[in-house]
UniProtKB/Swiss-Prot annotation:
There is a cross-link at residues 653-689 (Lysine tyrosylquinone (Lys-Tyr)). The keyword Magnesium does not apply. Residues 58-159, 188-302, 326-425, 435-544 form the SRCR domain. Belongs to the lysyl oxidase family. The modification 2',4',5'-topaquinone is found at residue 689. Gene3D superfamilies: SRCR-like domain. This is Lysyl oxidase homolog 2. It catalyses: L-lysyl-[protein] + O2 + H2O = (S)-2-amino-6-oxohexanoyl-[protein] + H2O2 + NH4(+). Residues 548-751 are annotated as: Lysyl-oxidase like. Contains 1 lysine tyrosylquinone. GO terms for cellular component: basement membrane; chromatin; endoplasmic reticulum; extracellular space; membrane; nucleus. Glycans are attached at residues 288, 455, 644. The fourth SRCR domain plays an important role in optimizing the catalytic activity of the lysyl-oxidase like (LOX) catalytic domain.
Length: 774
């Protein structure tokens, strides 16, 4: 860039779910690799604990943000207690997680990060190798021998993946009151032909997996609250009644395999691992008593609007939030993002103090999704802008909206580094199976191949790379569960895909960016046309779990705007780079001048990765006037519009150099324009285009006095992927009297409600991209 010289019973045992092929269509974990990359899980052989080791039970409790994490609690000698963090290690965490049925531990936490427990501290100075069958087999000071307090209670974060074939040890079930449910996996199995043909599956038997066997749950103690929890896990906001007579008739024809326990949920749980194990069920086949003469439990779930069958296309082709009070921003997937709430006409964020699964589930259900998979903290889904409306939210789980929960309106001590987010359970649509990447160096990149029907058969083929861009790539990465797109490729000759998939089967793809799948984008259908050919010009993508997010400082634009009448003889460099209006060519070069609307722009990267230019160094352009390279031809548009949305003047900045001008806190600068330096904007840093550098203006010499709208758009052509494009527009009202100009009500697009926007006198966006004749 050009620069001037200068409660313990309700706590849960974490569980679920490495999915078997049968249940994969019912419940999608996050994140996940495409099926073609997944390897079959090895058969699990649960180690046996030595005979002289005490029998214990474990659970994960406390203020959890995922069902697979929490404070470690141990049931021993008739009492639940905790574990001290002294000498605790990742090896001990592995033992805890595997004893609970998870593949491994991701990390562990000290100093009661999930809240202080109650009861005895059973284990202190715990030493494990990581191979023990039970935590009781690790060495320690002895049971209850400790000098710790509950401020030192240890917690663990387990992998979401379950051990295949894992079977929970229920040997202490008769000794422990209100034991949490432990199953390897759970699914909704469609029984009636009507529902077997539907996607997603919304009704059927509730089945749990024990070892390698799927079993039904007896409905003798089944309640609507249980159904609500199950529906929430599978991505549905609520449950409904069903035709019991049909299922009774169906059950009488088949022999059932029942799980020997019942469930006891309150209806507010985000996951069944938070529900209690209900009474045992009599299953004595010798006495002709099966499920106490009951039937298999059935659930019928209500899909949210996004996933409801709707018209001939069956599903809405693009997702647009319609909830007026809550929205999600910055997520890679539908049902994921930073939580923003509308208050007094302005959108603001939520502080993550006390943010948990219960509160996150209220948000998810409010937006038409299921319960929450994760309550995201620490602005891990990007930082928001504007006010922080809510803090210390505490929901019971029964609320219809997050604004019905108890909360603190004071946000002292909070900043946007603590913005809360959610990852919601969404219905499994099976869309991932209709797309794959081939030939890449890793599962996050490759040639795009789609599964289509041709002449009654399903065939894999390529997508034409003509006019393929980052927006289309974003849809592909989302559909595959691989996050955001980092690059879109129109040529993939260097990636050798499946030779049986070398035929182009999809062309003319044009996406808005919000579609659930590539098939929902506009395309040519069966009339495929790819003039450049197939194998060489097949579309490709590279995906990434994170993305940048650029936001302009609207206040700075408003504060730094002014007019300058600049002589033509001082604008020679600007003339060479076409930074002036067309009429400048007729202006006398010695006595003439141009009236320039000047301002400073400060562009922040609030995302989770660095913003890098689309082109590599080999494609950068040297600008002799400025003595450095420009890496992006189009990075920002500056436009002056009349009140009906027609452009009357525009900035003509030819190209841009990107660098870190300043950074937050102790973040290091990584990019600079000088000395052919690497270019970009580091996350947590900003690039400053000062008002006094060349071409940082709009030439308004030919604009008459009047009321106007000033608009700045960052990354207008979507050349670089971002986690949120909705905040790339800044709008201001302006008044020009022929001598002075005023800027007011400058703000980022989407910061206010539609009603408030109307009060500002703004329109939805640029209506005509051509300059109107003067």
């Amino acid at each position: 860039m050009e620069r001037p010289l200068c409660s313990h019973l309700c706590s849960c045992l974490a569980v679920l779910a490495l999915l078997s092929p049968l249940s994969l269509a019912q419940y999608d974990s996050w994140p996940h690799y495409p099926e073609y990359f997944q390897q079959p899980a090895p058969e699990y052989h649960q180690p046996q604990a030595p005979a002289n080791v005490a029998k214990i039970q474990l659970r994960l409790a406390g203020q959890k943000r995922k069902h697979s994490e929490g404070r470690v609690e141990v049931y021993y000698d008739g009492q639940w207690g905790t574990v001290c963090d002294d000498d605790f290690s990742i090896h001990a965490a592995h033992v805890v997680c595997r004893e609970l049925g998870y593949v491994e531990a991701k990390s562990w936490t000290a100093s009661s990060s999930y809240g202080k427990g109650e009861g005895p501290i059973w284990l202190d100075n715990l030493h494990c190798t990581g191979n023990e069958a039970t935590l009781a087999a690790c060495t320690s000071n002895g049971w209850g021998v400790t000098d710790c307090k509950h401020t030192e209670d240890v917690g663990v974060v387990c992998s979401d993946k379950r051990i295949p074939g894992f079977k929970f040890d229920n040997s202490l079930i008769n000794q422990i009151e209100n034991l949490n449910i432990q199953v390897e996996d759970i699914r909704i199995r469609a029984i009636l032909s009507t529902y077997r043909k539907r996607t997603p599956v919304t009704e059927g038997y509730v089945e749990v997996k024990e070892g390698k066997t799927w079993k039904q749950i007896c409905d003798k103690h089944w309640t609507a609250k249980n159904s609500r929890v199950i529906c929430g896990m599978f991505g549905f906001p609520g449950e409904r009644t069903y035709n019991a007579k049909v299922y009774k008739m169906f059950a009488s024809r088949r022999k059932q395999r029942y799980w020997p326990f019942s469930m006891d949920c309150t209806g507010t749980e985000a996951h069944i691992s938070s529900c209690k194990l209900g009474p045992q069920v009599s299953l004595d086949p010798m006495k002709n008593v099966t499920c106490e003469n009951g039937l298999p439990a059935v659930v019928s779930c209500v899909p949210g609007q996004v996933f409801s069958p709707d018209g001939p296309s069956r599903f809405r082709k693009a997702y647009k939030p319609e909830q007026p009070l809550v929205r999600l921003r910055g997520g890679a997937y539908i049902g994921e993002g930073r939580v923003e709430v509308l208050k007094n006409g302005e959108w603001g964020t939520v502080c993550d103090d006390k943010w948990d699964l219960v509160s996150a589930s209220v948000v998810c259900r409010e937006l038409g999704f299921g319960s929450a998979k994760e309550a995201v903290t620490g602005s891990r889904l990007g930082q928001g802008i504007g006010p922080i409306h809510l803090n210390e939210i505490q929901c019971t789980g029964n609320e219809k909206s997050i604004i019905d929960c108890k909360f603190n309106t004071e946000s002292q001590g909070c900043n946007h580094e603590e913005d809360a987010g959610v990852r919601c359970n969404t219905p499994a649509m099976g869309l991932q199976k209709k797309l794959r990447l081939n030939g890449g160096r890793n599962p996050y990149e490759g040639r795009v191949e789609v599964l289509v029907e041709r002449n009654g058969s399903l065939v894999w083929g390529m997508v034409c790379g003509q006019n393929w861009g980052i927006v289309e790539a974003m849809v592909v990465c989302r559909q595959l569960g691989l996050g955001f797109a980092s690059n879109a490729f129109q040529e993939t000759w260097y990636w050798h895909g499946d030779v049986n998939s070398n035929k182009v089967v999809m062309s003319g793809v044009k996406c808005s960016g919000t579609e659930l799948s590539l098939a929902h984008c506009r395309h040519d259908g069966e009339d495929v046309a790819c003039p450049q050919g197939g194998v060489q010009y097949g579309a490709g993508v590279a995906c990434s779990e994170t993305a940048p997010d650029l936001v302009l400082n609207a206040e700075m634009v408003q504060q730094t705007t002014y007019l300058e009448d600049r002589p033509m003889f001082m604008l020679q460099c600007a003339m060479e780079e076409n930074c002036l209006s067309a009429s400048a060519a007729q202006t006398n070069p010695t006595t003439g001048y141009r009236r320039l609307l000047r301002f400073s722009s400060q562009i922040h990267n609030n995302g989770q990765s660095d913003f890098r230019p689309k082109n590599g160094r080999h494609a950068w352009i040297w600008h002799d006037c400025h003595r450095h390279y420009h890496s992006m031809e189009v990075f920002t548009h500056y436009d002056l519009l009349n009140l009906n949305g027609t452009k009357v003047a525009e900035g003509h900045k030819a190209s841009f150099c990107l660098e870190d001008t300043e950074c937050e806190g102790d973040i290091q600068k990584n990019y600079e324009c000088a000395n052919f330096g690497d270019q970009g904007i580091t996350m947590g840093c900003w690039d400053m285009y000062r008002h006094d550098i060349d071409c940082q203006w709009v030439d308004i010499t030919d604009v008459p006095p009047g009321d106007y709208l000033f608009q700045v758009v960052i990354n207008p052509n979507f050349e670089v992927a971002e986690s949120d494009y909705s905040n790339n527009i800044m709008k201001c009202r302006s008044r020009y009297d022929g001598h002075r100009i005023w800027m007011y009500n400058c703000h980022i697009g989407g910061s206010f409600s539609e009603e408030t926007e109307k009060k500002f006198g703004h329109f939805s966006g640029l209506l005509n991209n051509q300059l109107s004749p003067q």
